[in-house]
Each structure stands twice: as C-alpha cells, then as structure tokens.
C-alpha cells in the first residue's frame, strides 16, 4: 500500500505517515518510491524537490527533499513560486524574470534582467552592458545582449 497517497512502495525507512506529516498526493510532483522515504518527505508539493537535507527530520533520499518545518537554514526549494510559504526558503519564480524574482532570501537568487534569468546562480550575476561584480559567484561576460555564466572575467 502506498505512503500518504504515493503510488510507489514504501521501504522500512518510510516510518509511516502520521498527523502533521502532510500529504504526498498527486501534487507531490509524481510520487514514486523516492518519495516514500523518512516521514520528513511526506510534505506538500513544495518540499518534494531536489536536495533539502534537514538534520531535524532525518535524511531524505532520491530526488525528493524534505523541507516543511525544517527551518530556513537549508535550501532546496527548486522551482516553487515566491508565494509558497512551505518552502525552506522563498524561491525565484519559474515563470520568468520580474521585479519579484530576485529575493535576497532565495536559496539561489536569480539574475533578473530584461534578457537574462539564470536560476542556477548561487549569487546574482552581472548582466548589463558593461559590468563586473566581484560579488558574483562567476562574474559574467557581459555584453549588450549576452550573459555567459561560465566566464571568469568580464569582457567589455
């Protein structure tokens, strides 16, 4: 029998789903065996996303994370929307680059300019006609219509 609505089988590590564990229904993003891991993973859809190791909840394996009430010290919110309150941290919207997209509290802040939005950045990128920000994880090679994350130096 599935765990919290998940269709996949549950191993001994699932520990069962009690009250307060949340549901793993269809909103879980396709619940499979990887969702039936320790109880921390039986959370709303926002938490069934990549890697969110929460020490207070145990280890969640596979491609699913275990956020929920684990606190803000861990990231792993994936593509959740900014309005999701059950993420470990607010996320940049996956729908595009708007003024709402760059939040300092995001796990991976986006670089949101008219022609650039790199969700894989660990720090905001510099994406303007002539700039090089030392605070960038990998300073961009910035030209009028280009933002290349693999650059180590800027080209003007």
Swiss-Prot record:
Question: Subunit arrangement?
Answer: Interacts with hair keratins.
Provide this UniProt record's keywords sorted from A to Z. Answer: Keratin, Repeat
On tissue specificity, the annotation reads:
Restricted to hair root, not detected in any other tissues.
Species of origin reads Homo sapiens (Human)
A GO cellular component annotation here is:
cytosol
sequence repeat ranges, renumbered to this chain: 35-38, 41-44, 47-50, 87-90, 121-124, 146-149
Q: Name the domain of life this protein comes from.
A: Eukaryota
What does the UniProt record say this protein does?
A: In the hair cortex, hair keratin intermediate filaments are embedded in an interfilamentous matrix, consisting of hair keratin-associated protein (KRTAP), which are essential for the formation of a rigid and resistant hair shaft through their extensive disulfide bond cross-linking with abundant cysteine residues of hair keratins. The matrix proteins include the high-sulfur and high-glycine-tyrosine keratins.
Family membership noted in the UniProt record: Belongs to the KRTAP type 5 family.
Residue ranges of the region described as 6 X 4 AA repeats of C-C-X-P: 35-149
| Protein name as annotated | Keratin-associated protein 5-11
Entry keyword Transcription regulation:
no
